[in-house]
């Protein structure tokens, strides 16, 4: 499930300095997730991944999100949910990059995207994964019940993503734009 995204990223033969920048953004997302461990579902990971994709490329967002999911779970616990989280974080970044990368980004549409993508894309994906992993006989009724039980958690995660986007939008995007222009990275 990750192969097309990784192949597309690797196909452009990234420079070492680009990989260092993505590793830094991944470390920032992991540190943010660890710093807010005490607040359930209030994590800056998706906001950082979205801003990475917006500042650079959709593939950069996917790689940052997938790596952040894998690495942060060394602190939070690996399990059968890890690939699903990696895919969810990565897709939130990739789609954000497709929608916003390479153009002037307005705050309100970005906040709406952050909220909706985390609630619909990440939330439904992880709810579906939970149903598939923990039930021997999946059904549509079971899927609806699983999604319904996750609504509050997904709303909190989506709302916190919008808040983190609001707080990080200007400072992080301006710094990333400066780095991109100065070093000609991820164009």
Regions picked out by a protein language model, each given a short descriptive name:
Residues 1-50:
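Hydrophobic transmembrane alpha-helices
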Residues 4, 45-61, 95-100:
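Generic transmembrane alpha-helix motif of multi-pass integral membrane proteins
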Residues 11-16, 54-64, 103-106:
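Membrane-helix interface "capping/anchor" motifs
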Residues 19-24, 47-48, 62-66, 83-87, ...:
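Hydrophobic alpha-helical transmembrane segments
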Residues 22-31, 51-56, 116-125:
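Small-residue-rich segments of transmembrane alpha-helices in multi-pass membrane proteins
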Residues 31-46, 66-100:
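Interfacial aromatic-anchored transmembrane helix boundaries in multi-pass membrane proteins
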Residues 38, 82-83, 98-187:
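Membrane-embedded alpha-helical hairpins and interfacial helices in multi-pass inner-membrane proteins
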